[in-house]
C-alpha cells in the first residue's frame, strides 16, 4: 500500500489550503455577481420562462 515517505511541511499545507480558499472565494464572487445580474433583470444571456398568462384553452 502506498504511503507518503515524509511529512508534508506546514508551509506546503498552508499553500494548498490558501489556493483552495482563493479558488472558492472567486467562484462565490462569480455566483453572487451572476445572481445579482439575473435578479436585476438586465441580463440578456439567460432564457427562462416569462410570467405570461396564456389562455389557449378557450
UniProtKB/Swiss-Prot annotation:
Species for this entry: Crocosphaera subtropica (strain ATCC 51142 / BH68)
Sequence segments annotated as region (Disordered): 1-22, 39-58
Highest taxon of the lineage: Bacteria
GO molecular function: structural constituent of ribosome
GO biological process, alphabetically ordered: translation
Keywords noted in UniProt: Ribonucleoprotein, Ribosomal protein
Family of the protein in this entry: Belongs to the bacterial ribosomal protein bL32 family.
Protein name in the entry: Large ribosomal subunit protein bL32
Keyword Transcription regulation: no
Membrane-crossing segments per the record: none
GO cellular component: large ribosomal subunit
Record InterPro entries: Ribosomal_bL32, Ribosomal_bL32_plant/cyanobact, Ribosomal_zn-bd
Amino acid at each position: 500500500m502506498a504511503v507518503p515517505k515524509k511529512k508534508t511541511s506546514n508551509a506546503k499545507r498552508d499553500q494548498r489550503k490558501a489556493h483552495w480558499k482563493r479558488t472558492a472565494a472567486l467562484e462565490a464572487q462569480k455566483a453572487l455577481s451572476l445572481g445579482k445580474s439575473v435578479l436585476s433583470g438586465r441580463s440578456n444571456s439567460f432564457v427562462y420562462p416569462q410570467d405570461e398568462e396564456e389562455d389557449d384553452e378557450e
